[in-house]
Amino acid sequence: MTIKRKKVSVIGAGFTGATTAFLLAQKELADVVLVDIPQLENPTKGKALDMLEASPVQGFDANIIGTSDYADTADSDVVIITAGIARKPGMSRDDLVATNSKIMKSVTKEIAKHSPDTIIIVLTNPVDAMTYSVFKEAGFPKERVIGQSGVLDTARFRTFIAQELNLSVKDITGFVLGGHGDDMVPLVRYSYAGGIPLETLISKERLDAIVERTRKGGGEIVNLLGNGSAYYAPAASLVEMTEAILKDQRRVLPAIAYLEGEYGYRDLYLGVPVILGGNGIEKVIELELREEEKMALDRSVESVRNVMEILS
């Protein structure tokens, strides 16, 4: 008898894609299909086999295959896109637009063909614009095309807060709004340590420094690595979102969602709090923003639109 499990396809078998595939399998969330270009089919198969051979040791039951044939992804419950060129030191996210938008269109055509009912999560940078590109190419309802940045940016923010206070990261909550770039908006006012507002625990000077470090978080890792970009935390963030969808958890998470008037913006993808469940984005949550917070979000939106103009 064949075991019927959920199915997740991960497009792009680089560091982030492969790590995502392994974490998905370890958590037994789904069978995993890891996909890359034909020239990299054997290395992709090798990575998948290596992961599968870890299953007896790690104690998980999940099938993992590597392939370059999108037919193997057919009827995926979730498809995660990590494919694209990597960000290099000194490279702005804007520099990635031309090449990665072409990759998105090519990949999305295959996804829509083989898994017309799937939910797509996009990681490829610049992720706000790439998610919009995938949305337009796929022709899916907006709820089923989602970008990942807020979970990652918020994780970085929570990490730095926990370090500052010498507390468990489990006790730190927070939200980061806006585009995935230097103009993102960590909302200190909606962030807490064990239910206590951060503003009562950390000085404004230190909070400002933590906010700035969060904004530069991706670049900090790029510069430290010297080659490539972060992949452990991005992969973990993708898995958290995927789990919320597959298990219909209706989690309140920050995600890149298509806006149609929420927060006063239209026809763009932007990082906002959402309810994430079995149908994808179940609802966009609108927070009340102070004037300075709304102005910061306006600046972030302007940055996102500037990148989107390159697409058009």
UniProtKB/Swiss-Prot annotation:
<dbReference type="InterPro" id="IPR001236">
    <property type="entry name" value="Lactate/malate_DH_N"/>
</dbReference>
<dbReference type="InterPro" id="IPR011275">
    <property type="entry name" value="Malate_DH_type3"/>
</dbReference>
<comment type="similarity">
    <text>Belongs to the LDH/MDH superfamily. MDH type 3 family.</text>
</comment>
<dbReference type="GO" id="GO:0006089">
    <property type="term" value="P:lactate metabolic process"/>
</dbReference>
<keyword id="KW-0597">Phosphoprotein</keyword>
<feature type="binding site">
    <location>
        <position position="125"/>
    </location>
    <ligand>
        <name>substrate</name>
    </ligand>
</feature>
<feature type="binding site">
    <location>
        <position position="36"/>
    </location>
    <ligand>
        <name>NAD(+)</name>
    </ligand>
</feature>
<feature type="binding site">
    <location>
        <position position="93"/>
    </location>
    <ligand>
        <name>substrate</name>
    </ligand>
</feature>
<dbReference type="GO" id="GO:0030060">
    <property type="term" value="F:L-malate dehydrogenase (NAD+) activity"/>
</dbReference>
<dbReference type="Pfam" id="PF02866">
    <property type="entry name" value="Ldh_1_C"/>
</dbReference>
<feature type="modified residue" description="Phosphoserine">
    <location>
        <position position="149"/>
    </location>
</feature>
<feature type="active site" description="Proton acceptor">
    <location>
        <position position="180"/>
    </location>
</feature>
<dbReference type="InterPro" id="IPR015955">
    <property type="entry name" value="Lactate_DH/Glyco_Ohase_4_C"/>
</dbReference>
<comment type="function">
    <text>Catalyzes the reversible oxidation of malate to oxaloacetate.</text>
</comment>
<keyword id="KW-0560">Oxidoreductase</keyword>
<dbReference type="InterPro" id="IPR036291">
    <property type="entry name" value="NAD(P)-bd_dom_sf"/>
</dbReference>
<dbReference type="Pfam" id="PF00056">
    <property type="entry name" value="Ldh_1_N"/>
</dbReference>
<feature type="binding site">
    <location>
        <begin position="123"/>
        <end position="125"/>
    </location>
    <ligand>
        <name>NAD(+)</name>
    </ligand>
</feature>
<feature type="binding site">
    <location>
        <begin position="12"/>
        <end position="17"/>
    </location>
    <ligand>
        <name>NAD(+)</name>
    </ligand>
</feature>
<dbReference type="GO" id="GO:0006099">
    <property type="term" value="P:tricarboxylic acid cycle"/>
</dbReference>
<feature type="binding site">
    <location>
        <position position="100"/>
    </location>
    <ligand>
        <name>NAD(+)</name>
    </ligand>
</feature>
<dbReference type="InterPro" id="IPR022383">
    <property type="entry name" value="Lactate/malate_DH_C"/>
</dbReference>
<protein>
    <recommendedName>
        <fullName>Malate dehydrogenase</fullName>
        <ecNumber>1.1.1.37</ecNumber>
    </recommendedName>
</protein>
<keyword id="KW-0816">Tricarboxylic acid cycle</keyword>
<feature type="binding site">
    <location>
        <position position="156"/>
    </location>
    <ligand>
        <name>substrate</name>
    </ligand>
</feature>
<dbReference type="InterPro" id="IPR001557">
    <property type="entry name" value="L-lactate/malate_DH"/>
</dbReference>
<keyword id="KW-0520">NAD</keyword>
<feature type="binding site">
    <location>
        <position position="87"/>
    </location>
    <ligand>
        <name>substrate</name>
    </ligand>
</feature>
<dbReference type="GO" id="GO:0004459">
    <property type="term" value="F:L-lactate dehydrogenase activity"/>
</dbReference>
